[in-house]
């Protein structure tokens, strides 16, 4: 179990461009900041961009009794409003929202720093030297750092939080 989890952590932060890793997903997104606009974030799958107009139309046609609100499509004003609020959290709170507002690219530096955290590097170094390439251990070389289960848990937690942030706050998709 420990070998499998630690090898997985190493793979998730692999910077080799051919690897399917959280690091490379982040880098692919960071290379195309022009796609990270408010309009694409909010309305990419058919949600209304101008939720106020849809809300106003809904209130005019409202009847007495229990109603269900659309959560997808052009009538989902509430979902659209929440998407605007989520976008505000990653681009700042502009006094007037504009379709071409962009996500603050400084967020990528923060996420990269999380994926390069010393505890993750400690786990990766241990895996490289004791699991993946144990035959290369130099008996006269420096001691191999040993990661504890707490280190592994913290490393995995950091990676999961970065992936969750990418999934929800950058790609506007539900997390895992």
Language-model features: locations:
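Histidine-centered, metal-coordinating catalytic motifs and their short helical/loop contexts
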Residues: 115-140
